[in-house]
């Protein structure tokens, strides 16, 4: 691929321009909340940000398909899994012309999205870091503290590993924050491949097998060509209180002591579009959950070859609850799918397995399957005090009770398990059809 520009992607799929400048204080949030899931991506001006800012770039599954160049879930999952196993090639090129951004962190498209949040948050930045030969790219929220200071939320995964390695040697971790990229790069940065598998290689695989990158001006970290904003930073040993922040579940994540990021230099690439994401928005949920759906799909498929659909539900932040549709071959397949899903995505809390005649995107059909095909004394799986998600406020100690519901019908099920059929009508379709429509 020539570059990983967000602008080139938006020009390909189409977008709509918002004809006013938005305040960082809640106006950006209202625009996202009012328009998400409806229509094309939007391009707006935000006060204090030099470049046009895109929102709702991949707030629907259809937009994710376009970002990956596929037409449906299975093809998308296969591309993500294949890119993880066989990453693409990074082609190093000369650094493009970049303009210094004297506003520093204050020039990033950060905003205050919810009442009670700690300040202006940026949730669309990819943090790229290389240390002792291991490179990582992942998405982390930044709380803007001033022109040269921000707080970063780091969970104990791969960036945390690199950060701890640096701190054990008394060093700050050199990193690069990149904003405004093709959504496939964001999707790759939201995956969790094994430590040492560089997420930019996954992005290259998703974008056709190769991706052009250049070295950041100060630290020399790889940056995808076409990035709108680039900031070389140090993740320091200093810590400050970070939060509250409204996360994927639309609840206020608790306040923690988190590292301070110190700015070394910030740059913009003229003519590009940058990007902001609201915590808990459909775009946030899609980017977080879709790679985990691919992991669940692959894990369950290895155990049961006929997996028809996987869905991490939007109401659970695309994170805690899964619905999986399968075609059973043997009794017990439902429980096998439950255990495979929990192993593939340790943050899962509840899993419902249904037959392939149930639409996983229709909560009424899923509840119907539970009502008609589930018995708690034989179809329920409970795993007490297992590792949970820090996003779940009811799992304060990091442990949770996991529950799986096998809502599949018996293999010898008779007509009593079938839903009534009306020729020419599909359950879940539009309810308010009028004669003549």
Swiss-Prot record:
Q: Does the keyword Flavoprotein apply?
A: yes
Give the metabolic or biological pathway: Isoprenoid biosynthesis; isopentenyl diphosphate biosynthesis via mevalonate pathway
**Organism ancestry:** Archaea, Thermoproteota, Thermoprotei, Desulfurococcales, Desulfurococcaceae
Taxonomy, superkingdom: Archaea
Q: Name one GO molecular function term.
A: metal ion binding
List cellular component terms (GO). cytoplasm
What is the designated name of this protein? Anhydromevalonate phosphate decarboxylase
What is its cofactor? prenylated FMN; Mn(2+)
Biological process, per Gene Ontology: isoprenoid biosynthetic process
UniProt xrefs under Gene3D superfamilies: UbiD C-terminal domain-like
Active site per database record:
247 (proton acceptor)
Q: Name one Pfam family in it.
A: UbiD_C
Organism whose genome encodes this protein: Aeropyrum pernix (strain ATCC 700893 / DSM 11879 / JCM 9820 / NBRC 100138 / K1)
Q: Where does Mn(2+) bind?
A: 136, 199
Q: Which reaction does it catalyse?
A: (2E)-3-methyl-5-phosphooxypent-2-enoate + H(+) = isopentenyl phosphate + CO2
What the protein does comes down to: Catalyzes the conversion of trans-anhydromevalonate 5-phosphate (tAHMP) into isopentenyl phosphate. Involved in the archaeal mevalonate (MVA) pathway, which provides fundamental precursors for isoprenoid biosynthesis, such as isopentenyl diphosphate (IPP) and dimethylallyl diphosphate (DMAPP).
């Amino acid at each position: 691929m020539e570059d990983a520009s967000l602008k080139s992607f938006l020009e390909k799929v189409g977008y709509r321009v918002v004809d006013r400048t938005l305040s960082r204080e809640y106006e950006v949030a209202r625009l996202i909340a009012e328009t998400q899931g409806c229509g094309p991506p939007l391009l707006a001006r935000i006060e204090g940000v030099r470049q046009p800012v895109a929102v709702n770039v991949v707030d629907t599954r259809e937009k994710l398909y376009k970002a990956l160049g596929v037409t449906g879930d299975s093809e998308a999952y296969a591309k993500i899994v294949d890119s993880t196993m066989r990453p693409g090639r990074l082609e190093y090129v000369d650094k493009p012309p970049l303009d210094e951004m004297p506003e520093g962190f204050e020039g990033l498209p950060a905003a205050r999205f919810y009442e009670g949040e700690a300040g202006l948050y940026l949730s669309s930045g990819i943090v790229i870091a290389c240390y002792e030969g291991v490179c990582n790219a992942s998405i982390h929220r930044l709380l803007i503290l001033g022109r040269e200071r921000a707080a970063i939320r780091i969970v104990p995964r791969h960036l945390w590993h690199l950060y701890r390695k640096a701190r054990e040697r008394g060093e700050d971790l050199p990193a690069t924050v990149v904003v405004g990229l093709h959504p496939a790069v964001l999707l790759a940065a939201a995956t969790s491949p094994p430590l040492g598998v560089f997420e930019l290689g996954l992005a290259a695989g998703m974008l056709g097998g190769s991706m052009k990158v250049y070295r950041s001006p100060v630290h020399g970290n790889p940056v995808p060509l076409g990035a709108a904003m680039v900031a070389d930073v140090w993740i320091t040993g200093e810590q400050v209180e970070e939060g509250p922040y409204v996360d994927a579940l639309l609840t206020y994540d608790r306040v923690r002591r988190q590292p301070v990021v110190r700015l070394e230099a910030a740059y913009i690439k003229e003519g590009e579009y940058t990007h902001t994401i609201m915590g808990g928005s459909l775009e946030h949920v899609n980017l977080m959950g879709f790679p985990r759906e691919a992991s669940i799909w692959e894990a369950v498929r290895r155990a049961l070859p006929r997996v028809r659909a996987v869905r991490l539900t939007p109401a659970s932040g695309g994170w805690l609850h899964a619905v999986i549709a399968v075609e059973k071959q043997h009794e017990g397949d439902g429980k096998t799918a439950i255990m495979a899903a929990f192993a593939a995505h340790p943050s899962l809390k509840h899993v419902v397995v249904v037959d392939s005649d149930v639409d996983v995107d229709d909560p009424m059909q899923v509840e119907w399957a539970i009502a008609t095909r589930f018995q708690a004394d034989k179809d329920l799986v409970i795993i007490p005090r297992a590792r949970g998600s820090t996003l779940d406020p009811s799992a304060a100690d990091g442990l949770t009770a996991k529950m799986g519901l096998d809502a599949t019908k018996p293999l010898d099920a008779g007509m009593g398990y079938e839903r009534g059929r009306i020729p020419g009508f599909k359950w879940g379709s539009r309810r308010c059809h009028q004669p003549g429509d």
